[in-house]
A protein has these predicted regions:
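Extended, compositionally biased accessory segments flanking or bridging domains
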Residues: 1-36
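Alpha-helix N-cap recognition
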Residues: 24-36, 154, 216, 231, ...
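Conserved phosphotransfer microenvironments
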Residues: 26-68, 73-86
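Compact structured core domains
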Residues: 65-148
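DNA-binding recognition helix and immediately preceding turn/loop
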Residues: 133-180, 201-212
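HTH DNA-binding helix-turn interface
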Residues: 170-184, 224-232
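Terminal helix-turn-helix DNA-binding modules in bacterial transcription factors
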Residues: 176-212, 239-257
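Sequence-specific DNA-binding recognition helix
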Residues: 200-236
């Protein structure tokens, strides 16, 4: 997977919970989805100040191959790159974070990957990467459902606020071969709860469950298992929403690209 424009091959590392160690991926072509447990992150190391073309070529390919794993940039001191410049150049590539040589990986990743704002900011592009490509209006509605989900426990109220007829919307999703809008709303609620679990590791499961609209911690636990195949305790050790949404789509029968 080499970019012949510079002849440099960026090294890719895998981080898995508890995100304390960079594990080099020796053979990227042999890496498979089962090799990436829930919460995995892939880090592309900038091979030098002139290596941006290589990173730009590799990043979208990794994101398409492994939509369940956020892709980030790793910059070591020897690369000679200003951190602000690295962040500016990484953003258009949808590299979710920039990991410096001295910063603890988990702390840096947690601040970015559990931010609810990043979900709605990145969701449109991520759906395309995942192979979910409905008409633009329908994709925009999916993003709106996620954006508005914290304020609306029920679909009817949300669609009413958006000025969308519920029957028409259900027909749109059915024609696109996607889970219904109510299922997307349920997934959104569960993802927001998951992000809080990841971000607020000392807050009790009951508190998060109730504040996220569930009757109790058992209700949230059942929903997490049903949608994501993972219990809250497991989710709490991970970071990011990509793996959760990828699992939910897979369990709902929406195949990856």
């Amino acid at each position: 997977m080499q970019d012949t424009r510079t002849g440099l091959t960026p090294t890719v590392f895998r981080l898995t919970p508890p995100y304390t160690r960079f594990e080099e991926v020796a053979n990227l072509d042999a890496l498979q989805l089962p090799d990436l447990p829930l919460g995995s992150v892939l880090a592309i190391e900038l091979p030098g100040h002139d290596g941006w073309a290589d990173v730009a070529a590799l990043a979208p390919r990794l994101r398409v191959r492994f939509p369940s794993a956020p892709v980030v940039l790793r910059v070591r001191g020897g690369a000679g790159v200003d951190p602000e410049e690295a962040a500016r150049r990484a953003a258009p590539l949808h590299l979710r974070a920039v990991l410096g040589e001295d910063a603890p990986p988990r702390e840096t990743l947690q601040a970015v990957l559990t931010d609810p704002a990043s979900l709605t900011h990145e969701l449109d592009d991520w759906l395309t990467v995942r192979g979910v490509a409905p008409p633009p209006e329908l994709k925009g509605l999916i993003v709106d459902i996620f954006r508005q989900a914290p304020a609306y426990p029920r679909l009817h109220g949300l669609l009413q606020a958006l000025g969308r007829p519920e029957r028409t919307v259900r027909n749109w999703f059915q024609r696109a071969g996607l889970p219904g809008p109510g299922s997307w709303l349920a997934a959104a609620h569960a993802v927001y709860a998951a992000l809080r679990l990841q971000r607020e590791r000392q807050t009790s499961l009951l508190t998060i469950a109730v504040e996220c609209g569930y009757s109790d911690h058992s209700s949230l636990s059942r929903q997490a298992v049903r949608l994501f195949g993972a219990r809250p305790g497991e989710i709490r050790q991970t970071l990011g929403w990509e793996g959760l949404l990828d699992r939910w789509l897979g369990r709902a029968g929406v195949r990856a690209a």
